């Protein structure tokens, strides 16, 4: 069975957490998620989440730690999910993917 590694970012500021809703043209449109995405070939988990945050939110982030990981099995695919706490970020957060 195919295994896909996915990263997600836990961004907390003043007791609020950032979650994003998937855009209307995306798979699972309208569902809520932490920002992040799939690991590319020859990419580390840390590099993946930093790249995804730059692509999706136009921010440069500093990782705090790996918070948790979870394995989700669908009919045809296994997803290994890795959630990172974000220590700090810079840039004006722009939503480039979600609605």
Where on the chain are the PLM-derived regions?
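Conserved acetyl-CoA binding element of GNAT-fold acetyltransferases
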Residues: 32-37
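A conserved beta-turn-beta hairpin within the catalytic core of GNAT-like acetyltransferases
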Residues: 26-30
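Unchanged
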Residues: 39-63, 71-99
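Surface-exposed, flexible loop/turn segments at secondary-structure boundaries
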Residues: 17, 25, 72-74
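Conserved N-terminal beta-strand and adjoining loop/helix that marks the start
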Residues: 1-18, 38
């Amino acid at each position: 069975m195919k295994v896909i590694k996915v990263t997600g970012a836990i961004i907390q500021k003043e007791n609020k957490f950032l979650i994003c809703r998937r855009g209307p043209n995306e798979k699972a449109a309208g569902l809520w998620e932490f920002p992040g995405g799939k690991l590319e070939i020859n990419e580390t988990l840390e590099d993946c989440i930093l790249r995804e945050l730059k692509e999706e939110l136009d921010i440069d982030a500093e990782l705090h730690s790996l918070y948790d990981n979870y394995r989700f099995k669908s009919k045809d695919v296994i997803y290994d999910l890795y959630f990172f706490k974000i220590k700090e970020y810079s840039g004006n957060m722009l939503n480039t993917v979600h609605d």
